[in-house]
Amino acid sequence: KIDEHHFLVLYLKIAAMFFGSKNYQNTVKYGQKIINSKGNVQEDLLFHTRILMLMAKFESGFDDDYDDFVKATMKFAKKMKNPGDLHFSIVNFFKKINDRNPKDQAIAFKEFEKELEISSQNKYDKRTLMYIDIHGWVTSKVRNVDVIEIIKEKVKLK
C-alpha cells in the first residue's frame, strides 16, 4: 500500500511533468492537491511545490494571484523549521521579476542564474535544488530556449 507522502511526491512529479510540457494549468492543479493535503506534509515538499507553482504562474501569464502567492510562500518559508538563505533568495527572486519589463527580467534572470550556480556548489543548497530544477528553468530563460532543452543537456552530461 502506498502512503500519503508517496502519493504527494507522485503529484509533484506529475506537476513537474506538466510544467515540462507547458501545461501550466495542470501544474498548478496538481500542486494545489499537495498544498491542500490534510495530512502531515513535509515542509520541503510543500516549499518546492510552491516554487514549481510560481514558475507555472509566471510562465502562463495567468498571474492574478501571483503576488499573493509569493507573499504566502514567503510567509511559509519564514515558518519553516530550518530555512536556508537559498529558500529566501528563491522567493525574493519571484517577488521581483513579475513587475519588471522584459529587459529588466532578463537581467534579473542572469543575476539569479549566477547566484544559483554558486549555490549549486554548496552541499546543503544542492539538495534544495534537486527537488525542482529551478536552476535549469532560469538557465532556459537566460538562453531563451525551452526548459526541456536544458534538461536534455543535463541528462547527456550524466
Residue ranges and their predicted role:
Residues 1, 29-39, 71-82, 114-117:
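Amphipathic alpha-helical segments of tetratricopeptide repeats
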Residues 1-11, 39-50, 80-90, 122-129:
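Alpha-solenoid helical repeat architecture
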Residues 6, 12-16, 20, 48-52, ...:
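"A position-specific structural signal for the A-helix of alpha-solenoid helical repeats
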Residues 31-32, 50, 70, 89-92:
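Short acidic (Asp/Glu) and glycine-rich catalytic loops that position anionic groups and cofactors
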Residues 35-42, 53-60:
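Short secondary-structure capping micro-motifs at structural edges
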Residues 77-158:
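Long, ordered, amphipathic alpha-helical scaffolds
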